[in-house]
């Protein structure tokens, strides 16, 4: 039943993308079918097949060790301030982890390890799905770094991207999350193995929906075998790389903290207004979260959430789209134990992406800053990219639900 439900959800999600496709006759069936099969195969290996699941759980435990190492530095700095009552203080336990992992990724970048990983995964995706090297490389980079950093690896080529490539790169960025913030989600109570699996599944999903909604109609500039990745200015040495990474991580952590503070407070204001307004008509308990739940509950049901849990699941999906994934994860993490394992898995996958309305401004600032001549294209494609990124996350969630 789970497999049939998941397949029906996957077909429905792909059908939605097909409806929004600009050039249906130009859709490459190979990209869609192979991309979908890649996601299903990966989901089966890490969630259902005992040997594959054991290996992935081992890998997840190694990643969890990195979080423990990060906590050593956090404890040294904050000591007894780390806890407020019985719960760790968010600003002192979650945000500093982002700083540590940003520094770690910067060191791996300096040692050329990340570039090698990008090339291997990107090359594999390009051969499997028949996508260009540029967009495949960007999709691979998005597994580990965020939508702001991944375009840097293809910086010299952005201005000359085809419209389809530009859209696909935008979609890939929105369907994934940054490696540094991923570990922040884990500290909110989201199982690390689900977050890692969702990040890897986002790569083929982003390519599939990018090519479904805006198929390629032009000749790409990166069909040549001598395509080279941009590696940036780099750091003087490992210490310099770690320092620069920590500084970048601090900026991200401060932005996340400020954003959460503002959004949580604004939600409280909105809920106060809604409660007062609807209270005049005798309606109690009307909140932004409950409204989003009613709007998005059919989508939650479509991807495999049982109907009795769909209202709350839909609320988190709506929060992720309208606000952002960190707000949704922080609320979901507080109640994850109240859901069935299947629903908790589906929600964990569905929220794992940057596809929200505020990300359009981020894309304009990053991609538009790297290629000012494409800013108008990015602005026009923004809403469609959010749709494509959201559908990519929902597809991963539907597939994950098949194997729980």
Curated annotation (Swiss-Prot):
InterPro entries referenced in this protein's UniProt entry, alphabetically: C_nuclsd_transpt (IPR008276), C_nuclsd_transpt_met_bac (IPR018270), CNT_C_dom (IPR011657), CNT_N_dom (IPR002668), Gate_dom (IPR011642)
Membrane topology summary: Multi-pass membrane protein
Keywords linked to the UniProt accession: Cell membrane, Membrane, Transmembrane, Transmembrane helix, Transport
Entry-linked NCBIfam families: nupC (TIGR00804)
Lineage: superkingdom: Bacteria
Compartment(s) of residence: Cell membrane
Family: Belongs to the concentrative nucleoside transporter (CNT) (TC 2.A.41) family.
Taxonomy of the source species: Bacteria, Bacillati, Bacillota, Bacilli, Bacillales
GO biological process entries: nucleoside transmembrane transport
Protein encoded by which gene: yutK
Pfam families: Gate (PF07670), Nucleos_tra2_C (PF07662), Nucleos_tra2_N (PF01773)
A GO molecular-function annotation: nucleoside transmembrane transporter activity
Predominant cellular place of this UniProt entry's protein: membrane
Organism, scientific name: Bacillus subtilis (strain 168)
Gene Ontology cellular component terms for the protein in this record: plasma membrane
Protein's recorded name: Uncharacterized transporter YutK
Ranges that cross the membrane: 1-21, 32-52, 89-109, 182-202, 261-281, 285-305, 344-364, 384-404
UniProt KW Electron transport keyword: no
